[in-house]
Amino acid sequence: MTEVAGKMAFVLEILGEIYYFRSMKKLLYVHGYNGSPDGGSCRLFKKHKPENWEVIGMDYCQDDCELALRQIRETIEREGIDVVVGCSLGGFLTLLTTGVRRFVVNPCYLPSVELPKLKPFEGFPAPSPELIATYAAQEWRLKQLPEVDRKNITALFGDSDELLGMKYRDMMADDLGILGGIVPSQHHISEEAVLLICQMLSDERMKDAHRHSFENEEEIKASETCGCFSCCRTFAPNEIEDWVDDADGKTALCPYCHTDAVIGDASGLPLDKTFLHAMNLRWF
Protein backbone atom coordinates (compact mmCIF):
# COMPACT_ATOMS: atom_id res chain seq x y z
CA MET A 1 0.00 0.00 0.00
CA THR A 2 1.40 3.41 -0.96
CA GLU A 3 1.77 6.18 1.61
CA VAL A 4 -1.07 8.15 -0.02
CA ALA A 5 -3.35 5.11 -0.08
CA GLY A 6 -2.51 4.41 3.55
CA LYS A 7 -3.42 7.95 4.56
CA MET A 8 -6.66 7.74 2.59
CA ALA A 9 -7.58 4.47 4.31
CA PHE A 10 -6.91 6.08 7.70
CA VAL A 11 -9.06 9.11 6.84
CA LEU A 12 -11.90 6.88 5.64
CA GLU A 13 -11.70 4.86 8.85
CA ILE A 14 -11.95 8.02 10.96
CA LEU A 15 -14.84 9.32 8.85
CA GLY A 16 -16.57 5.99 9.27
CA GLU A 17 -16.27 6.22 13.05
CA ILE A 18 -17.59 9.78 13.03
CA TYR A 19 -20.48 8.65 10.80
CA TYR A 20 -21.28 5.75 13.10
CA PHE A 21 -21.32 7.79 16.28
CA ARG A 22 -23.31 10.59 14.65
CA SER A 23 -26.07 8.05 14.22
CA MET A 24 -25.96 6.91 17.86
CA LYS A 25 -28.98 7.50 20.06
CA LYS A 26 -28.77 8.04 23.81
CA LEU A 27 -31.10 6.83 26.56
CA LEU A 28 -30.96 8.39 30.02
CA TYR A 29 -32.10 6.19 32.91
CA VAL A 30 -33.43 7.97 36.03
CA HIS A 31 -33.62 5.65 39.04
CA GLY A 32 -36.11 5.69 41.89
CA TYR A 33 -35.78 6.62 45.57
CA ASN A 34 -32.46 5.43 47.02
CA GLY A 35 -31.66 3.78 43.71
CA SER A 36 -28.39 3.80 41.82
CA PRO A 37 -27.30 4.76 38.30
CA ASP A 38 -25.38 1.46 38.25
CA GLY A 39 -28.22 -0.66 39.66
CA GLY A 40 -29.87 -3.71 38.18
CA SER A 41 -32.50 -1.77 36.24
CA CYS A 42 -29.93 0.32 34.37
CA ARG A 43 -27.87 -2.80 33.70
CA LEU A 44 -30.92 -4.43 32.10
CA PHE A 45 -31.24 -1.52 29.69
CA LYS A 46 -27.55 -1.77 28.84
CA LYS A 47 -27.99 -5.50 28.26
CA HIS A 48 -30.98 -5.18 25.91
CA LYS A 49 -30.44 -1.77 24.28
CA PRO A 50 -31.08 -1.65 20.54
CA GLU A 51 -28.14 -1.42 18.16
CA ASN A 52 -26.59 2.06 17.99
CA TRP A 53 -28.06 3.05 21.36
CA GLU A 54 -26.06 4.14 24.39
CA VAL A 55 -27.52 3.90 27.89
CA ILE A 56 -26.47 6.48 30.47
CA GLY A 57 -27.33 6.17 34.15
CA MET A 58 -27.23 9.31 36.25
CA ASP A 59 -27.42 10.14 39.91
CA TYR A 60 -29.25 13.17 41.20
CA CYS A 61 -29.89 15.01 44.45
CA GLN A 62 -33.05 13.24 45.60
CA ASP A 63 -33.31 15.51 48.65
CA ASP A 64 -34.43 18.44 46.47
CA CYS A 65 -36.88 17.91 43.61
CA GLU A 66 -36.19 21.21 41.88
CA LEU A 67 -32.43 20.60 41.96
CA ALA A 68 -32.94 17.04 40.69
CA LEU A 69 -34.97 18.32 37.73
CA ARG A 70 -32.26 20.85 36.94
CA GLN A 71 -29.59 18.13 37.06
CA ILE A 72 -31.61 15.94 34.69
CA ARG A 73 -32.07 18.85 32.27
CA GLU A 74 -28.34 19.63 32.36
CA THR A 75 -27.52 15.99 31.64
CA ILE A 76 -29.92 15.92 28.69
CA GLU A 77 -28.33 19.02 27.18
CA ARG A 78 -24.74 17.98 27.90
CA GLU A 79 -25.06 14.40 26.63
CA GLY A 80 -27.51 15.01 23.79
CA ILE A 81 -30.11 12.65 25.24
CA ASP A 82 -32.85 11.36 22.92
CA VAL A 83 -35.00 9.37 25.36
CA VAL A 84 -35.47 9.46 29.14
CA VAL A 85 -36.71 6.44 31.10
CA GLY A 86 -37.70 6.90 34.74
CA CYS A 87 -38.96 4.40 37.30
CA SER A 88 -40.85 5.04 40.54
CA LEU A 89 -39.72 8.42 41.92
CA GLY A 90 -37.57 8.74 38.83
CA GLY A 91 -40.81 8.38 36.87
CA PHE A 92 -42.24 11.46 38.58
CA LEU A 93 -39.11 13.43 37.70
CA THR A 94 -39.23 12.12 34.14
CA LEU A 95 -42.85 13.19 33.70
CA LEU A 96 -41.83 16.76 34.55
CA THR A 97 -38.85 16.73 32.19
CA THR A 98 -40.51 18.26 29.15
CA GLY A 99 -39.38 18.49 25.56
CA VAL A 100 -37.98 14.98 25.17
CA ARG A 101 -39.33 11.50 24.40
CA ARG A 102 -39.82 9.66 27.67
CA PHE A 103 -41.03 6.44 29.26
CA VAL A 104 -42.21 6.11 32.85
CA VAL A 105 -42.52 2.75 34.58
CA ASN A 106 -44.56 2.44 37.79
CA PRO A 107 -44.28 6.20 38.32
CA CYS A 108 -44.64 7.58 41.82
CA TYR A 109 -47.28 9.97 40.51
CA LEU A 110 -47.94 11.63 43.88
CA PRO A 111 -44.75 11.66 45.97
CA SER A 112 -46.54 13.57 48.72
CA VAL A 113 -48.75 10.48 49.23
CA GLU A 114 -46.21 7.69 48.69
CA LEU A 115 -42.95 8.94 50.20
CA PRO A 116 -44.32 9.26 53.78
CA LYS A 117 -45.11 5.51 53.67
CA LEU A 118 -41.45 4.54 53.26
CA LYS A 119 -39.54 3.26 56.27
CA PRO A 120 -35.77 3.13 56.90
CA PHE A 121 -34.31 0.38 54.73
CA GLU A 122 -30.84 -1.20 54.52
CA GLY A 123 -29.16 1.75 56.16
CA PHE A 124 -31.11 4.39 54.23
CA PRO A 125 -33.26 6.74 56.33
CA ALA A 126 -36.94 7.32 55.70
CA PRO A 127 -37.70 10.41 53.58
CA SER A 128 -37.66 13.54 55.70
CA PRO A 129 -40.61 15.96 55.77
CA GLU A 130 -38.34 18.55 54.14
CA LEU A 131 -37.51 16.19 51.26
CA ILE A 132 -41.17 15.28 50.75
CA ALA A 133 -42.15 18.95 50.69
CA THR A 134 -39.85 19.65 47.74
CA TYR A 135 -41.71 17.04 45.65
CA ALA A 136 -45.16 18.03 46.85
CA ALA A 137 -44.41 21.57 45.69
CA GLN A 138 -43.97 20.34 42.09
CA GLU A 139 -47.03 18.08 41.78
CA TRP A 140 -49.28 20.83 40.41
CA ARG A 141 -47.12 20.94 37.28
CA LEU A 142 -48.35 17.52 36.14
CA LYS A 143 -51.75 18.82 35.07
CA GLN A 144 -50.08 21.80 33.38
CA LEU A 145 -48.06 19.68 30.95
CA PRO A 146 -48.77 20.94 27.41
CA GLU A 147 -50.97 18.67 25.30
CA VAL A 148 -48.29 18.35 22.63
CA ASP A 149 -45.73 17.30 25.24
CA ARG A 150 -47.97 14.60 26.70
CA LYS A 151 -47.75 12.81 23.36
CA ASN A 152 -44.05 12.27 24.11
CA ILE A 153 -44.89 10.16 27.18
CA THR A 154 -45.42 6.40 27.32
CA ALA A 155 -46.46 5.02 30.71
CA LEU A 156 -46.16 1.39 31.77
CA PHE A 157 -47.56 -0.19 34.92
CA GLY A 158 -46.57 -3.51 36.45
CA ASP A 159 -49.36 -6.01 36.92
CA SER A 160 -47.83 -7.06 40.27
CA ASP A 161 -46.62 -3.73 41.67
CA GLU A 162 -46.55 -4.44 45.39
CA LEU A 163 -46.02 -0.77 46.34
CA LEU A 164 -48.29 1.29 44.12
CA GLY A 165 -50.67 -1.18 42.52
CA MET A 166 -52.54 0.20 39.50
CA LYS A 167 -54.18 3.26 41.04
CA TYR A 168 -52.00 5.81 39.26
CA ARG A 169 -52.81 4.29 35.88
CA ASP A 170 -56.39 5.54 36.20
CA MET A 171 -55.30 8.86 37.69
CA MET A 172 -52.89 9.57 34.84
CA ALA A 173 -55.61 8.71 32.34
CA ASP A 174 -57.98 11.18 34.02
CA ASP A 175 -55.43 13.95 34.60
CA LEU A 176 -53.26 13.70 31.50
CA GLY A 177 -55.20 11.60 29.01
CA ILE A 178 -52.38 9.04 29.06
CA LEU A 179 -53.61 5.46 29.31
CA GLY A 180 -50.66 3.41 30.46
CA GLY A 181 -49.90 -0.08 29.26
CA ILE A 182 -49.78 -3.08 31.59
CA VAL A 183 -46.60 -5.17 31.71
CA PRO A 184 -45.56 -8.24 33.73
CA SER A 185 -43.57 -6.60 36.52
CA GLN A 186 -43.38 -5.92 40.21
CA HIS A 187 -42.48 -2.41 41.38
CA HIS A 188 -38.87 -2.78 40.29
CA ILE A 189 -38.87 -2.92 36.51
CA SER A 190 -38.81 -6.43 35.12
CA GLU A 191 -36.67 -7.70 32.28
CA GLU A 192 -39.85 -8.17 30.21
CA ALA A 193 -40.70 -4.47 30.60
CA VAL A 194 -37.16 -3.46 29.64
CA LEU A 195 -37.34 -5.66 26.54
CA LEU A 196 -40.66 -4.06 25.57
CA ILE A 197 -39.25 -0.53 25.85
CA CYS A 198 -36.15 -1.46 23.87
CA GLN A 199 -38.31 -3.00 21.16
CA MET A 200 -40.42 0.16 21.02
CA LEU A 201 -37.28 2.29 20.73
CA SER A 202 -35.95 0.14 17.91
CA ASP A 203 -39.27 0.37 16.08
CA GLU A 204 -39.49 4.14 16.57
CA ARG A 205 -36.02 4.56 15.13
CA MET A 206 -36.97 2.55 12.07
CA LYS A 207 -40.09 4.66 11.63
CA ASP A 208 -37.94 7.78 11.83
CA ALA A 209 -35.53 6.29 9.29
CA HIS A 210 -38.43 5.39 7.00
CA ARG A 211 -39.40 9.07 6.78
CA HIS A 212 -36.16 9.70 4.87
CA SER A 213 -37.33 7.41 2.04
CA PHE A 214 -40.06 9.69 0.67
CA GLU A 215 -40.16 13.27 -0.61
CA ASN A 216 -36.38 13.05 -0.36
CA GLU A 217 -35.04 14.66 -3.55
CA GLU A 218 -33.13 17.41 -1.76
CA GLU A 219 -31.58 15.01 0.75
CA ILE A 220 -30.64 12.47 -1.94
CA LYS A 221 -28.91 15.13 -4.04
CA ALA A 222 -26.94 16.25 -0.97
CA SER A 223 -25.73 12.68 -0.36
CA GLU A 224 -22.59 10.89 -1.50
CA THR A 225 -24.04 7.38 -1.12
CA CYS A 226 -27.56 5.99 -1.16
CA GLY A 227 -28.94 2.70 0.04
CA CYS A 228 -32.12 0.78 -0.76
CA PHE A 229 -33.75 -1.22 2.02
CA SER A 230 -35.76 -3.25 -0.50
CA CYS A 231 -32.87 -4.86 -2.42
CA CYS A 232 -30.23 -3.81 0.19
CA ARG A 233 -27.86 -2.36 -2.43
CA THR A 234 -25.83 0.83 -2.09
CA PHE A 235 -25.13 3.16 -5.01
CA ALA A 236 -24.31 6.73 -6.00
CA PRO A 237 -27.12 9.30 -6.19
CA ASN A 238 -26.42 9.94 -9.88
CA GLU A 239 -27.49 6.36 -10.64
CA ILE A 240 -31.07 7.28 -9.73
CA GLU A 241 -33.08 8.00 -12.87
CA ASP A 242 -36.70 7.71 -11.78
CA TRP A 243 -38.64 9.80 -9.29
CA VAL A 244 -42.23 9.78 -8.09
CA ASP A 245 -44.12 13.04 -7.61
CA ASP A 246 -45.55 13.10 -4.09
CA ALA A 247 -47.59 15.78 -2.34
CA ASP A 248 -44.63 17.80 -1.04
CA GLY A 249 -41.76 16.73 -3.26
CA LYS A 250 -40.17 13.99 -5.30
CA THR A 251 -39.39 10.49 -4.02
CA ALA A 252 -36.43 8.54 -5.38
CA LEU A 253 -36.86 5.07 -6.89
CA CYS A 254 -34.08 2.52 -6.58
CA PRO A 255 -32.23 2.12 -9.92
CA TYR A 256 -32.04 -1.65 -9.33
CA CYS A 257 -35.42 -2.74 -7.93
CA HIS A 258 -37.47 0.41 -8.74
CA THR A 259 -38.83 0.59 -5.19
CA ASP A 260 -39.36 3.80 -3.21
CA ALA A 261 -37.07 2.57 -0.43
CA VAL A 262 -34.04 4.78 -1.01
CA ILE A 263 -32.24 6.68 1.75
CA GLY A 264 -29.26 8.99 1.32
CA ASP A 265 -26.34 9.28 3.71
CA ALA A 266 -27.13 12.98 4.18
CA SER A 267 -29.84 11.66 6.52
CA GLY A 268 -27.12 10.74 9.02
CA LEU A 269 -28.23 7.10 8.98
CA PRO A 270 -25.67 4.27 8.68
CA LEU A 271 -26.27 2.71 5.26
CA ASP A 272 -24.43 -0.53 6.00
CA LYS A 273 -25.77 -4.02 5.32
CA THR A 274 -26.91 -4.48 8.92
CA PHE A 275 -29.05 -1.35 8.85
CA LEU A 276 -30.50 -2.02 5.40
CA HIS A 277 -31.40 -5.61 6.26
CA ALA A 278 -33.01 -4.50 9.53
CA MET A 279 -35.10 -1.97 7.62
CA ASN A 280 -35.99 -4.64 5.08
CA LEU A 281 -37.26 -6.96 7.79
CA ARG A 282 -39.32 -4.15 9.33
CA TRP A 283 -40.93 -2.80 6.17
CA PHE A 284 -41.06 -5.69 3.69
How would you describe each model-predicted region?
Residues 237-241, 263-264:
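Short, non-ligating residues that shape and space the ligands of small metal-coordination modules
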Residues 101-204:
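The alpha/beta-hydrolase serine catalytic core
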Residues 25-79:
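Active-site catalytic motif of lipid deacylating hydrolases and related acyltransferases
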Residues 228-231, 254-257:
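Short cysteine-rich clusters marking metal-coordination/redox-active sites
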Residues 241-251, 269-270:
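Short linker/helix segments within small regulatory modules
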Residues 85-94:
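Gly/Ala-rich beta-loop-alpha elbow adjacent to hydrolase catalytic centers
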Residues 223-228, 251:
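Residues immediately within or flanking Cys/His clusters that coordinate Zn2+
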